A protein has these predicted regions:
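Glycine-rich phosphate-binding loop signature in dinucleotide/nucleotide-binding domains
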Residues: 2, 93-100, 125-127
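Short, well-formed alpha-helical segments that are part of the catalytic scaffolds
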Residues: 18-41
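Conserved N-terminal catalytic core of the sugar/cofactor nucleotidyltransferase
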Residues: 34-97
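N-terminal nucleotide-binding beta1-loop-alpha1 segment
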Residues: 1-19
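Conserved SAM-binding loop
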Residues: 24-25, 50, 104
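Conserved acidic residues
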Residues: 5-6, 46, 67, 100, ...
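Conserved core of the sugar-phosphate nucleotidyltransferase
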Residues: 80-86, 101, 107-140
Length: 140
């Protein structure tokens, strides 16, 4: 793929339903590590950004040389906060980028396959789509 693509990993520190949810382990790795590994192993992204209000989460990203860590303010890191303000806050503070696409990798979707990511991005680019979203159907 010749396109420059950013992987944006939003990961809030506070969770009311499951404490430290994004740091929970599945096997030997936590959800942050799984998502970062998927982004890096896919070799799809020219830049991978971990955005969080939590120093503990950003510290996990520090283990990876190719990860850009971005601390977001508490005002956009609440239980009711959406992902879009975190993305806009990043770009407002980082004006030097040349990427053409942005892919949001939710930490709470650790079962994604790299092949699915590749197929998804390839499809979006080939169809010249401006927006794409993946969903999973619930089987009855």
């Amino acid at each position: 793929m010749n396109k420059k693509i950013i992987a944006f990993i939003p990961a809030r520190g506070g969770s009311k339903s499951i404490k430290n949810k994004n740091l929970k382990k599945i096997g030997t790795k936590n959800l942050i590590e799984i998502t970062i590994d998927q982004a890096l192993k896919s070799k799809l992204f020219s830049k991978t950004i971990l955005s969080s209000d939590s120093n503990r989460i950003l510290k996990v990203g520090k283990k990876y040389k190719k990860i850009e860590r971005f601390k977001r303010p508490p005002s956009i890191s609440k239980d009711t906060s959406k992902t879009e303000p975190a993305i806009l806050n990043y770009f407002k503070n980082n004006l030097n980028y040349s990427e053409e696409y942005l892919v949001i990798l939710q930490v709470t979707s650790p079962l994604r396959k790299i092949k699915t990511l590749k197929n998804f991005i390839s499809y979006c680019i080939s169809k010249k789509l401006k927006n794409c979203l993946t969903v999973t159907y619930k089987k009855d």
